[in-house]
A protein has these predicted regions:
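Helix N-cap/capping motif at the beta->alpha junctions
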Residues: 36-42, 65
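Generic detector of well-ordered alpha-helical packing
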Residues: 9-10, 58
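Conserved sequence signature across two-component system core domains
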Residues: 7-8, 37-39, 54
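Non-catalytic signal-transmission and effector/linker regions of two-component phosphorelay proteins
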Residues: 1-5, 15-18
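CheY-like receiver
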Residues: 45, 51-114
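Two-component/phosphorelay signaling modules centered on CheY-like receiver
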Residues: 11-35, 74
């Protein structure tokens, strides 16, 4: 089972990503456990943050996804980080925190599947 966390302040975006992940799971026979968080603070307050993959929105109030990624990297070098953003100009900054890549919003199955 692959444990996936989604941190995004927009419910619609979280729902689109969950739909893409569900489709991936069904098409590949891969079991996924997906948890969602509506802001960085809720993620940081969670008791169980042992994820294999984290999808982070870059543009969130209070703490950006980039700031959250920096905090995550202080204690976890292994989790795969993927940024989901409509701010392409910031997406490349994700590589400074060891992000695997980024997905441009709105999330389309084609871009997710690649």
């Amino acid at each position: 089972m692959i444990r996936i966390g989604i941190v995004d302040d927009e419910k619609q975006e979280r729902d689109q990503l969950k739909q893409a992940l569900a489709r991936f799971s069904a098409e590949n026979g891969t079991e996924l456990n997906v948890q969602e968080f509506d802001c960085a603070a809720v993620y940081l307050a969670a008791q169980d943050r042992d994820f294999d993959i984290l999808y982070l929105d870059i543009d969130m109030p209070q703490m950006s996804g980039m700031e959250l990624a920096e905090k995550i990297r202080e204690t976890n070098q292994d989790v795969i980080l993927i940024f989901c953003t409509n701010l392409q100009q910031f997406a490349l900054n994700g590589y400074s925190v060891g992000a695997l890549g980024f997905i441009v919003k709105p999330i389309q199955w084609y871009s997710f599947h690649m």
